[in-house]
Amino acid sequence: MCHDTAPALFPRTASTGSIDGAICALCYAGATRGPRLLVLPDIYGCNAFYRGYAAYLAEQGAGEVLLVDPFAAFGELATVTREAAFQRRHRLADRAYVEELIDFIDGQRIEGVVGFCLGGLFVFELARQQVVSRLVAYYPFPQGLENRDPLDVPFDYLPALRSRHTVIVGDDDALLGTQNLQRLQAQARANDAIDLHIMNGAGHGFLADLESPDTARAAVAKRGLRIGTTTLLGG
């Protein structure tokens, strides 16, 4: 699991509303006239971490944050296990979902999107289609993912991509792998639209270390959180 529990620095603010339709989302109202943001979670969906993260972005200056639930049509996980999450995830048709997501983003006037893991893969596709100007992907999959309706493999189009996007990964991400990390580094060096940040000593899902007793790991997680927040909110 990338993350489950919300760290103490995330507010325990309840959502202020919800949206139901082709795209379902929880709404978190901010106190400012800042940008409208959208959060794409990992395969476990809208758990406590992502609800807290959406509330955190609203508190930090977003006008409103929409936490999208890609798996709303399939119901909650009966058991929160990796196997159950993957079984549900494979029911999602990635390409069709992202097409609906793009229409939703346009209709909701979203100005920034952040995605984690699977959601990070979706962010690459949003960058390819030049959907919004503020894009952040945490530990995404530039090598692509298998699916019954797969998206194009990011490695195939990243060299020519012109839409700037921020990618934040750990140098010890076993799901990304060393070869894929090196390939991503090479593409980022050749294309300044790829704003790549590599967190030293961090693995997949490193924001789970925000409250780690290991001060070095916690510092890396806080730096990664800060990079993404600054990109989304400006500054």
Curated annotation (Swiss-Prot):
The active site is at C117, D173, H204. It catalyses: 2-(5-oxo-2,5-dihydrofuran-2-ylidene)acetate + H2O = 4-oxohex-2-enedioate + H(+). Disulfide bonds: none annotated. Keywords: Aromatic hydrocarbons catabolism, Hydrolase, Plasmid, Serine esterase. Pathway: Aromatic compound metabolism; 3-chlorocatechol degradation. Pfam families: DLH (PF01738). GO terms for biological process: catabolic process. Its EC number is 3.1.1.45. It comes from the Bacteria. InterPro entries: AB_hydrolase_fold, Dienelactn_hydro, Dienelactone_hydrolase-like. GO terms for molecular function: carboxymethylenebutenolidase activity. Monomer. Ring cleavage of cyclic ester dienelactone to produce maleylacetate. Carboxymethylenebutenolidase is specific for dienelactone and has no activity toward enol-lactones. Belongs to the dienelactone hydrolase family. This is Carboxymethylenebutenolidase 2. The gene is tfdEII.
